[in-house]
């Protein structure tokens, strides 16, 4: 159901509720939920929709789910990419054999190119 859009999921729940009633009067709680549009949520559901961030022993800061990308950018420091190899120079043959060949293997072109003869 996570793949369905919110509107489609709500419509599906409405259809299931109406099919379960089968002509009987709806209980008051079900009617209230249908009239609210499912906006009422329990404490656990409301807490699940937030990201809790603890910064340097401060009090937790709650961020809503819609702001997760902005919050992640604001809270995460810029990171330098880790170097793939730790070779000091190109004369270190052992490092070149074990490290740089892997880099070439990962970054190589996946499509074979035809050999052109002159």
Curated annotation (Swiss-Prot):
Expressed by the venom gland. InterPro entries: Endothelin_toxin_CS, Endothln-like_toxin. Residues 1-23 form the signal peptide. SMART domains: END. Pfam families: Endothelin. It is found in: Secreted. One of its GO terms (cellular component) is extracellular region. Vasoconstrictor activity. These toxins cause cardiac arrest probably as a result of coronary vasospasm. Sarafotoxin-i3: vasoconstrictor activity. Causes cardiac arrest probably as a result of coronary vasospasm. Displays low agonistic activities towards endothelin-2 receptor (EDNRB) (displays affinity in the micromolar range). This is Sarafotoxin-i1.
């Amino acid at each position: 159901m996570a793949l369905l859009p919110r509107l489609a999921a709500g419509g599906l729940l409405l259809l299931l509720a109406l099919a379960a009633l089968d002509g009987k009067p709806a209980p008051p709680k079900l009617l209230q939920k249908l009239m609210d549009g499912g906006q009422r949520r329990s404490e656990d559901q409301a807490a699940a929709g937030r990201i809790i961030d603890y910064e340097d022993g401060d009090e937790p800061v709650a961020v809503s789910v819609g702001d997760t990308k902005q919050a992640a950018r604001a809270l995460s420091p810029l990171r330098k990419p880790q170097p793939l190899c730790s070779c000091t120079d190109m004369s270190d043959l052992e490092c070149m054999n074990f490290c740089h060949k892997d880099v070439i293997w990962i970054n190589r072109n996946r499509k074979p190119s035809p050999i052109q003869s002159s």
